[in-house]
């Protein structure tokens, strides 16, 4: 298995701030695969792109107690932290490492 990076974070959902995890597996060509976990559900991260400064974009479709949600995400991964947003029909939801809140 390729090396993977795990980022524990907080996402601000309409129901409040909730813990989440993003797992990233860099493919070495500016793309990445991964998983996103929130509210006890895990889903694959698709179309992941990341540059040398850690700026990323990706897509995710996850089914939780809130229903099925399609989102595009963008932000930056740096110094072991994540600072980004997920954009979906529920609005823009910040995703940040706990120390960035």
Predicted feature descriptions by range:
Residues 1-79, 83-101:
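Central antiparallel beta-sheet cores of small beta-barrel/beta-sandwich binding domains
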């Amino acid at each position: 298995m390729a090396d993977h990076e795990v980022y524990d974070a907080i996402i601000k959902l309409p129901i409040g701030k909730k813990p989440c995890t993003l797992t990233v597996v860099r493919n070495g060509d500016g793309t990445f695969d991964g998983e996103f976990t929130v509210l006890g559900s895990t889903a694959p991260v698709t179309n992941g792109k990341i540059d040398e400064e850690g700026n990323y974009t990706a897509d995710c479709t996850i089914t939780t107690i809130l229903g099925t949600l399609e989102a595009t995400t963008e932000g930056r991964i740096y110094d072991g932290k994540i600072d980004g947003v997920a954009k979906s029909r529920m609005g823009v939801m910040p995703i940040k490492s706990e120390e960035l809140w």
